[in-house]
Amino acid sequence: MARNSSMGKTRSIENFEVRHTGNSEAVPFVKQHHYSGRCHGGAMCWSLIDTKHDELIGVAAFVTPISENVRRSLWEDNKKEELKHHVTELHRFVTLDDTPHNTETWFLSRALKGLKDYKPKYKAVISFADETFGHVGTIYQALNAIYYGKSGSAKYYKDEDGNMRSPREGGYNVSNAEAKERGWTIHKRESKHRYVFLLPDPYESKEDVFEDMCVESLEYPKA
């Protein structure tokens, strides 16, 4: 959800379009409206456009996970090396608050299809719902994503502007002492709920993709 919005406009899904866009508008939009205040500069972005008002009202940003272990962890042992390159992550997803009911599921389903069309190699898209901010993944559940449990708890920093900062910045581990020197405060991050969307090739089914995975499909968490 967005941190703020353009209230007062009447919007209709009939006027919405999903477009694969560059980062020059999409990334600043995410930084302004996503609760984290941050977005990877190299993300693959799909934008939600309100054509009636010629306005950007949402962004889905995908980034390949830096950690090879994260990408490998989805697959059975005999598939880990082959399929680790077929995983990406829904890095940021945000829409303005004044969009109609079901906008988020409508938008995300089309962004995922757009991603598969653009990069057919991707078979799995992982996404995390952050309990620290009260998220359980309701949108992902509505799109039948596979829920495969929680990550471990961790820490994060907040900078002087209130933006979240990762303990790993630009490939460099930031210690607690260094964070304090920068004026950052230390916070505990609760576990994240882990989901994966399956993107089968035309000759496959979702069941075919899931057969190569080692994760267990669990019951959805409730808010």
What does each model-identified segment do?
Residues 44-46, 58, 88, 138, ...:
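Residue-level detector of short, conserved catalytic/binding motifs and their immediate flanks
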Residues 15, 43-45, 122, 192-194:
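Extracellular structured ligand-interaction cores
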Residues 2-41:
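Short amphipathic alpha-helix that is part of the acyltransferase structural core
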Residues 20, 63-185:
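Acyl-donor binding region in acyl/amide transferases
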Residues 30, 43-64:
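Conserved beta-hairpin
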Residues 38-42, 187-190:
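A short catalytic or substrate-binding loop motif that flags glycine-/basic-rich loops and adjacent residues
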Residues 177, 181-212:
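Long, intrinsically disordered, low-complexity Ser/Thr/Pro-rich regulatory/activation regions
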Residues 207-223:
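Short, cationic low-complexity segments
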